[in-house]
Amino acid sequence: MSEAAIAKKETLVQAAAEKFESAASVVIVDYRGLTVEEVTNLRKQLRDAGVEMKVIKNSILSRAAKKVGLDGLDEVFTGPTAVAFSNDDVVAPAKIIDEFAKDAKALEIKGGVIEGKVSSVEQITALAKLPNREGLLSMLLSVLQAPVRNVAYAVKAVAEKNEEVA
């Protein structure tokens, strides 16, 4: 192999390693059996959510993962592999791919990385079932508002009772 080819591959490994390091979550899928239209549709959905999907050679992915200390991913880097990287939303790639896989049976989640830790298929699908960030924040807000609301109702009830007595 020529020095230029080796340098090019090292550049690709470095770029993939940087993506692994900077990503909040990574979902690794086998896209074998999907039509071009399905892959295009999946890429569009992911792009709309701020997620980048790339098809990268398994050998480059394996070296990049080892370079950033992500051991245990070698078994998922077999066959046709696409990788979805999300820098902001941890849940988005898992949720979109899991939903898409319900319609496109050929799409198979192989594994992933959540906040720098190697994750199994089960962990990725469990993550996909969580509400998105806005949903979680609204749940938290309603939980925080409940005690204040209850105190307000109690004060109102006491005030109404005092008015009836007077």
UniProtKB/Swiss-Prot annotation:
One of its GO terms (molecular function) is large ribosomal subunit rRNA binding. It holds the Pfam family Ribosomal_L10. One of its GO terms (cellular component) is ribonucleoprotein complex. Keywords: Ribonucleoprotein, Ribosomal protein, RNA-binding, rRNA-binding. InterPro entries: Ribosomal_uL10, Ribosomal_uL10-like_sf, Ribosomal_uL10_bac, Ribosomal_uL10_bac_type. One of its GO terms (biological process) is translation. Belongs to the universal ribosomal protein uL10 family. Forms part of the ribosomal stalk, playing a central role in the interaction of the ribosome with GTP-bound translation factors. HAMAP family: Ribosomal_uL10. NCBIfam families: PRK00099.1-1. PANTHER family: 39S RIBOSOMAL PROTEIN L10, MITOCHONDRIAL. Part of the ribosomal stalk of the 50S ribosomal subunit. The N-terminus interacts with L11 and the large rRNA to form the base of the stalk. The C-terminus forms an elongated spine to which L12 dimers bind in a sequential fashion forming a multimeric L10(L12)X complex. This is Large ribosomal subunit protein uL10. It comes from Enterococcus faecalis (strain ATCC 700802 / V583). The lineage of its organism: Bacteria, Bacillati, Bacillota, Bacilli, Lactobacillales. The gene is rplJ.
